[in-house]
Design a protein with these regions (language model features):
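C-terminal helical/coil "lid" or tail adjacent to the Rossmann-like core of SAM-dependent
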Residues: 194-229
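Conserved S-adenosyl-L-methionine
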Residues: 182-193
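A short hydrophobic/small-residue beta-strand
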Residues: 63, 137-138
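Short, glycine-/aromatic-enriched active-site segment of Class I SAM-dependent methyltransferases
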Residues: 142-166, 175
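A short glycine-rich, Lys/Arg-flanked "PGG" loop and its adjoining helix->strand segment in the class I
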Residues: 121-136
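Alpha/beta-hydrolase-fold catalytic nucleophile elbow
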Residues: 140-142, 190
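Conserved N-terminal segment of class I S-adenosyl-L-methionine
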Residues: 1-101, 107-111, 121-124, 188-190, ...
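Residues lining the SAM
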Residues: 111-114, 140
């Protein structure tokens, strides 16, 4: 077995995500079972670093990005600067309400946002409002298992505004979605690599990045090697189910 190169380690998050079901280029799916078609109007609410937006633009979708954080919005726009299919718009907003018309979107992507908002019921209602009848929804929040594991070691600010205001249990997450009027079509979990990464990061203490790399780099090398073994896919699925970083719902608006 060969050692991971620095480039291998740089690409490990993307590799792990792809093996979880994200960024399925050949199938035109942002996540397994969530197709993005040319011409679709996609809303990326809480666009973060722009990875989801970039994929959707590459699929030929029309994309509107939104985030409460001007830094995140800027990151997304820099990432897709010069793209032959640029975003239709970029909105700095707390999404309460979303400054968009009713029923405009074919697909709504909202990853790792709901745990941050003060009123998740009102927030999800806004996501439903802006979707067309039949619109597709990809929603993720942190999994309760890793959130509970982090409680004793995370920085206090991790569970304070503007960070994680709540831990959503699996049944509560699904209920939030269905009571907003959406139909749940699939559920999944993923991200064990990041669960363990964050536990190591908290162990490093506040002196980032000096004390961080000696802990997380060996972990990244171990995970890269594990994925390359014959049992790697089974091992990944086992741990993604056991200690996932995130839980995911694919849903549809009736109509």
């Amino acid at each position: 077995m060969t050692d991971a190169s620095e480039r291998d380690l740089d690409l490990l998050p993307l590799r792990d995500a792809a093996e979880s079901g994200w960024f399925r280029v050949d199938q035109g799916e942002l996540f397994r079972g969530f197709p993005i078609a040319p011409g679709d109007l996609v809303l990326d609410i809480g666009c973060g670093d722009g990875g989801n937006t970039n994929f959707c633009l590459n699929c030929g979708a029309r994309v509107i990005v939104a985030d409460i954080d001007p830094g995140a919005l800027g990151s997304t726009l820099r990432r897709v600067a010069g793209h032959e299919n640029p975003p239709l718009g970029a909105i700095l907003t707390d999404s309460n309400p979303l400054p968009l018309r009713d029923g405009i979107a074919d697909a709504i992507v909202c990853t790792e946002v709901i745990e941050h908002v003060a009123d998740p019921v009102a927030f999800v209602a806004e996501l439903v409002r802006v979707g067309k009848p039949g619109a597709r929804y990809l929603l993720t929040v942190p999994d309760p298992v890793i959130e509970e594991l982090q409680k004793p070691c995370a920085a206090p600010s991790y569970f304070e505004h503007p960070n994680h205001l709540r831990i959503l249990q699996k049944d509560a997450f699904e209920r939030l979605v269905t009571e907003a009027g959406l139909i749940v079509e699939a559920r999944d979990t993923y991200g064990f690599y990041w669960s363990f990464w964050w536990l190591m990061a908290w162990a490093a203490g506040p002196n980032w990045p000096e004390d961080l790399q000696p802990l997380v780099q060996p972990w990244s090398r171990t995970w890269w090697a594990a994925l390359g073994t014959p049992q790697g896919p089974k091992l990944k699925r086992l741990f993604d189910d056991l200690i996932p970083k995130s839980q995911l719902i694919l849903a549809r608006k009736p109509g």
